[in-house]
Amino acid sequence: MLRGALKLAIVAYAAVILGFVWLTKDLTFATLARDPLFATYSIAVVLYVLGRFVVALFYRSVPDRGFRPTVSIIIPAFNEEDGIIGTIASCLAVDYPASRLQVIAVDDGSSDRTWERIQEAKQRWPQLYAVTLGRNYGKRGAMAEGIRRATGEILVFVDSDSYLDADAVVNLVQPFADRRVGAVVGHADVRNSGVNWLTKMQQVRYFSAFRVIKGTESLLSGTVTCASGCCAAYRRRVVLPLLEGWEFQTFLGRPATFGDDRALTNRILTGHRVVYQASARAETVAPERLRVFFRQQLRWKKSWLRESMQVLRYFWRKNPAAAVFTYASIAFPFMAPWVVLHAVAGRLLGGEPGGLWFYVVGTYAMALLYSLFYAFKRQDGLWFHGMTFVALYMSVLVFQTYWGILTMRDTRWGTRASTVEHARIDQGLVVALPPDVRRPPQAMGARFGRPDDYQHGRREGESAAADHAPVLER
């Protein structure tokens, strides 16, 4: 009954849009004819959005065919004392063969009681592999340490404020039965979606970003451009050769300290497929305050800008349709601020008001399309909150592209140093890492720009007892 009503609503929506165009055709076409650049942008955006929806309608998750590789779940954590035990518990409670599952919690030198909480979890669940880096190296350093400790064929990353569904891992690994797949991203919902209007809006946006955008990218020859850290899996043998370049990535002469997931995905995409698995679900905590939300969006925008430069170099060799969608998704954020300013300036200077009106109504129409799609898939009453995104987009977010460029060298969030090889200290016993993941410090420093305290890493062949790296394992 409800689904029928939603289908009717979507049909009615299409009728309203067509009616709007017909009734205002003189104004609309006159406005577009006088401004060919605005017309080109408007038509391109409509085709882009509708094209994604059409492709996404054909998306289906890979079914469970009994594929059960060994899995290592890695949880990098920094100052998450309130939620880390819940995250660990959700990872240990997944419906997956215990003999084929490893869970690793890495404390990135937290200044609160995160390490104590991890130790409490270790006492409750002895199978947990617990590591602390002693001081803050940044998320990428914690992820890299987890990779070095992992033994599974598949590496699953879970953010320390995220929670896996019971069947998430089983579903997440199924696409890896295809040897061409190097990474898989699951679906994330907002755990705190009921807190306020901002979290409700983000729930609708998250759903659209995963189900529509990643769903489309996945169908187009496995070209998902970001395996989000709240629930993502990688083939270990594919990651290890890329580990050095990713961990010590620099940009504009500085260490890359955010966008870790997008950067790793970018490297995987050069030789393998990255797909979306909607049936592998997780929940993550979203910002509840506008200030935090805007900072998060700016970080994401900066990493998107950095990695898009790499995408431009090779994506044309991927699926042609995927390349068109991807290059368009890069071009539009650069064009949008000028379109907004052009429309507003034209109205303020006494020009034809149709441009501004057409842009605002068109943007709301696209937002309504996403919201109705959410309503069709999720009957939780939150669909209308997707419309509030338009106001934030046109007033703030649309201009973040250029602000991100101007502040690109500001890497204060997640600043880190790193070592290549840490010693494992357990009750006074120091044990070297497995030799297959060891890297000579000289080579890494020379190629990728070694941080000063990288010198503390142990050189190939040195005595482990002489190493004083700040890594504890319990």
Segments from the language model and where they lie:
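Short linear elements at protein peripheries
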Residues: 228, 234-236, 412-437
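Active-site-adjacent helix/loop segment of glycosyltransferases
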Residues: 4, 291-342
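Membrane-embedded multi-pass helical conduit in multi-pass membrane proteins
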Residues: 19-57, 62-66, 326-411
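Short helical patches
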Residues: 5, 436, 440-451
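Non-transmembrane catalytic domains and loops of membrane-associated enzymes and transporters
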Residues: 65-315, 446, 450-451, 458-464, ...
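N-terminal membrane topogenic signal
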Residues: 1-10
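Cytosolic juxtamembrane regulatory segments of multi-pass membrane proteins
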Residues: 72-86, 396-406, 422-441
